[in-house]
Amino acid sequence: MAKESSFDIVSKVEFPEVQNAIQMTLKEIGTRYDFKGSKSDVTLEKEELVLISDDEFKLNQLKDVLSGKLIKRDVPTKNIEYGKIENASGGTVRQRAKLVQGIDKDNAKKINAVIKNSGLKVKSQIQDDQVRVTGKNKDDLQQIIAAVRGADLPIDVQFINFR
């Protein structure tokens, strides 16, 4: 009997990279002319980003700068869920953004559906916040990786532990 191969599908955000992107964003808004004299700031509190600025327009500009820096640092921007804009102290506005870690049940079911629709002889099982895919043929597993990458999922996924 041939040995089965497997890999895990996960969704992770590297927090040191997020911190680096925040530092680069703060450095850029400190030197930009349109942010001179404004109270714009980005902080990381546990698994949540907090963006503060003078008004909604500057907050959206801050978000654009942050997104660009996150993309340069290979942090998936699909895994950021922005909350609503709220008023903060001192006439500023604040927006919280949750960094999504792991694959929830709904997204795991979507990934399983993509795997089942491929028609390949592989098994997939949901394990907490990841999906494990096993099969006898490594080529089938590589086709599954291509199918999941090509699927339009609401979160960004990574593939680890390919054995």
From Swiss-Prot:
GO molecular function: nucleotide binding
Protein origin, superkingdom: Bacteria
Record keywords, A-Z: Nucleotide-binding
Pfam families per record: DUF520 (PF04461)
Single GO cellular component term: cytosol
Coiled coil: none
Entry function: Nucleotide-binding protein.
Family as reported in the entry's similarity comment: Belongs to the YajQ family.
This protein's name: Nucleotide-binding protein RBAM_011030
Organism: Bacillus velezensis (strain DSM 23117 / BGSC 10A6 / LMG 26770 / FZB42) (Bacillus amyloliquefaciens subsp. plantarum)
Lineage, uppermost ranks: Bacteria, Bacillati, Bacillota, Bacilli, Bacillales
